[in-house]
């Protein structure tokens, strides 16, 4: 490829609204162009990288037995209504009407679509298992699109779905796809982790995320320093904590505690640890057609994990869509006094009350007395009836691993893949069944598997690039080599550049010849910005000494290569990481 023919509109400066380096570099280097909020055009350089990522994905998925299909991006809203997700998904689901007043959605995921296909065409256990996947455009109407391709509204996704006759078969395919995803991310040269995760709006009994480690990541994962335990902070667990020695021994009583509203200040007032203070956190619960309140109790030195709290509510049948901070008006309407909320008589104020599971043996506790400037001491939760307990706290770095007691540590990460065991939920709601070996009708066991193809462009750059521009991995760079001529007006240098270009092409090297009549410094700046793996410099000394200077983009390391061994050395360098 000649640079003069390449459509790569580089910019002098990155967009002013770009925060992450991946967004800055992709826009400034001419990879992407923004159409609207969270919507991007992929220009030739980005398309080359996308093609490489997609080719790796196709190869590994098909090696693991998955079959490639292409489903409609537009899906009947009635299918989403049958599955129950039309309301559950919320405003992120874009719904529209056609000219005949039929409702459709732009798919963020395609569980309903693929389940309908299976229901119509898979009739017998003899056709199972089957794993179908696609790479296609998706749309999710994000409330706050940001960070370029990391949180876009329109994106490219590899999504796959498997159908099975029983849970054992699903378990095998779950592990099979996990292996395929590991191979894909290894091929892409990424440092990643596989972590236990929340299933969210997709649903299912179990899920795992594939996350790329980067300080700019949106997510926090919790990792054990001693064993392989790793989980998204939204569902991370910890081992049971030892009780502090300073136990506040007291008979049940009510004490005046003026202006003492935080767990820390209450602990100091009673000369004990926040561990023994019952902290109440009130949230507004958003349902399909109403709003209610929920109160969550945790120990004073713990924090509420909102995802765990929402899941706990739905386990007890709340059918909650979302949790929000309760306003002062909400508290006043319910007769609650912030800083003094406790379990006594609370049920008449709040319909949903959940205690963290660490409080099951809770005694000698200090709680709000549901009266301004008063707390109760000597509270024993075992004296209350029908309390609901669940794991609702956010794991801290001072906590210990639930598997081996090792120290837990936070890491920032960016999710690039997610696999789910869906079970029979979608099959039952959409009446998707088959006949088993005994001729009896059974619902499919399903799996769901996704990788963010367009997000991977950002993930690679967040992990690998530097302040100068794009640094791609071995299998993802748009070009292997860019040939940079020091003085394009020098006919001898120009002639040699074309000769070298042809020599490299004949060896299968994807080379870019910078044939622009531009300053050498500007050409090198574009090399740093665009991120070809190697830059081969042709200058006056090349002609005199028959030696080339070669620069690795990954670390800007320079190497001198003799003309006689040019092809051999270039291929050697490209084969290495």
From Swiss-Prot:
Keyword Aminoacyl-tRNA synthetase: yes
EC number: 6.1.1.15
This protein's UniProt keywords: Aminoacyl-tRNA synthetase, ATP-binding, Cytoplasm, Ligase, Nucleotide-binding, Protein biosynthesis
Gene Ontology molecular function terms on file: aminoacyl-tRNA deacylase activity; ATP binding; proline-tRNA ligase activity
Primary location: cytoplasm
Localization annotation: Cytoplasm
InterPro entries: aa-tRNA-synt_IIb (IPR002314), aa-tRNA-synth_II (IPR006195), aa-tRNA-synth_II/BPL/LPL (IPR045864), Anticodon-bd (IPR004154), Anticodon-bd_dom_sf (IPR036621), Pro-tRNA-ligase_IIa (IPR002316), Pro-tRNA-synth_IIa_bac-type (IPR004500), Pro-tRNA-Synthase_IIa_type1 (IPR023717)
Reactions that this protein is recorded to catalyse: tRNA(Pro) + L-proline + ATP = L-prolyl-tRNA(Pro) + AMP + diphosphate
UniProt superkingdom: Bacteria
Function: Catalyzes the attachment of proline to tRNA(Pro) in a two-step reaction: proline is first activated by ATP to form Pro-AMP and then transferred to the acceptor end of tRNA(Pro). As ProRS can inadvertently accommodate and process non-cognate amino acids such as alanine and cysteine, to avoid such errors it has two additional distinct editing activities against alanine. One activity is designated as 'pretransfer' editing and involves the tRNA(Pro)-independent hydrolysis of activated Ala-AMP.
Domain notes: Consists of three domains: the N-terminal catalytic domain, the editing domain and the C-terminal anticodon-binding domain.
Name of the protein: Proline--tRNA ligase
Record lineage: Bacteria, Pseudomonadati, Campylobacterota, Epsilonproteobacteria, Campylobacterales
Gene behind the chain: proS
